[in-house]
Amino acid sequence: MATQEFQAETKRLLDIVINSIYSNKEIFLRELISNASDAIDKLYYKSLTDNSLDFNKDDYYIKITVDKENRQLKISDTGIGMTRQELEDNIGVIARSGSLDFKKANEQEIKDGHDIIGQFGVGFYSAFMVAEEVTIISKAYGSDHAYKWESEGIEGYSVSPTEKESVGTDVILKIKENTDDEDYDQYLDEHRLKSIVKKYSDFIRYPIKMDLTKSKPKDDNEEEYEEYIEEETVNTMVPIWERNKNELTDEDYKNFYRERHYGFDEPITHIHINAEGTISFKAVLFIPERPPFNFYTKEFEKGLELYSNGVLIMNKCPDLLPDYFSFVRGVVDSEDLSLNISREMLQQDKQLKLIAKNIKNKVKKELKNVMENDREKYEEFFESFGTLLKYGIYSEFGQNKETLQDLLLFYSSKENKMVSLDEYISRMGEDQKYIYYATGESVERIDKLPQTEFVKDKGYEVLYLTEDVDEFAIKMMGSYQDVEFKSVSSKDLGLDSEDEETSDEKEKEYKGMFDKMAEILSDKVNTVRASERLKDHPVCLANEGEISIEMEKVLQSMPNNQNVQAEKALEINVNHDVFDKLTEAYEQDEDKFKLYTDLLYNQACLIEGLPIEDPVKYTNNVCKIMS
């Protein structure tokens, strides 16, 4: 029995595989099971045109058998089998369509095996990652002869006649001995093998059978147990996404959510997709109630389970979800994707991009549906993931705002709950020009801000923005339904004031005093002026430029900040008793005037939650006033 040499590129591949340090060696079982499933598929397709072949699905299966004593693992199928010529031609992906890609990779001097295995997959040859010797015994449908293919690796292979009663293929692996770095015994452990099947091949359409060791009480003594062997089908076969959604209950989806370990919570909703057309795929997606513990950390990996025809390609495919929907969990299955498609190829895959676009639109539609029909659930969701949606608007220069802006919720001055932008717009007065908002650390603090007095007294609703990202997202949006956003701290609120004439008169009358205050505070504010917005409070800070005071606080808190400063105006309530004291000091006592100016500025800072530059000086000034 002559040994034949492998082709040069196949020999190089085998050398890489055999000596590979690739950590994910368990995928060999996925590859061999997929080959077995394909073999049964071929027999099924043949039965469609061959009347003499009666295909009964119950007769077709894949069997995994362990022989620990001889360190053998056997994967058998009842598929179409292979002739001698097919054994010569068809063993391994690289021997066929993969050879050109392999040559390209070889030219790039890929050395460690990770790229080869990850990029191209290695099909049958992956068996050599865990086996020192591989034997294939196969009998083709319609043939009276069976053949044995044997190889110990790069030295070559042999093909010889053998005996086999039934049509199909047995792949027998002689598992390697353990090393200091690798535990190969695990591939002879039935429970470990079962877990690998569940992970990668749970939804193969044919039964995957194993003889499993179990125990039961002895007949004569229930306190003692005896072991027995029972054949068990270890895969689910028909995944939930292949079933008719009209036949499934909410409990079916919840059970699947738990079985796949998507979370300890319950999903607030699910999405079952069966898309046909330019790209065909099926998916079951879940929107969880709460984020996982590591969701807002670098350790979190977004992505959906990606299957090709029931076989897991990638445990988490990040390209299926935009970052702002990274909370979505679930599975996608498409027959249009290659089993061995790599991460690099997926990123360029047009079909995958079409799937991702479809998923994005479905998730958006479902979130909007929950928002409109189950507000309580949506608010629970928004409490967990609303921040992510806002970052989605702010990032990428606002290009996602059309997708996300109608999903936002904010606290409101008129409602003791969160409101949407649509709800705000629907309640606007006829003469209202803007969507008004105020920023702060909490609803309670914002509600007491002096800047909100004037707008609320006009009867207008104010949105309360309590998160760091809120105003950045609002600035990126600019407007909603052609209505511009306006901070209550802006210079021009677009509102008529009964005190406007008084303020203008006082502004002119006391221009010298305001200019002097601005000079004293020249390194802190851009201007000092009479306020049109203040009612009960003596003083406040207002925004002069694009960067607001709240944005300044956020930017200042970041590492490597560039000391970004908001342009500020100090506004004085000319109708407050304090104003009379201020003018009196301006006219009579320069030192007291400087003291009052400093106190009023620091008071305004405290209201805004800004730090006081010199707390000791401030407390001393307060003591001077009191003494």
Curated annotation (Swiss-Prot):
Species annotation: Natranaerobius thermophilus (strain ATCC BAA-1301 / DSM 18059 / JW/NM-WN-LF)
What is the name of this protein? Chaperone protein HtpG
Give a yes or no for keyword Chaperone in this entry. Answer: yes
The record's gene field reads: htpG
| MF GO annotations | ATP binding; ATP hydrolysis activity; ATP-dependent protein folding chaperone; unfolded protein binding
**What is this protein's function per UniProt?**
Molecular chaperone. Has ATPase activity.
Q: Which HAMAP family match?
A: HSP90
SUPFAM superfamilies, per database record: ATPase domain of HSP90 chaperone/DNA topoisomerase II/histidine kinase, HSP90 C-terminal domain, Ribosomal protein S5 domain 2-like
Map out region (A) in residue numbers. 1-343
* CDD domains, alphabetized: HATPase_Hsp90-like (cd16927)
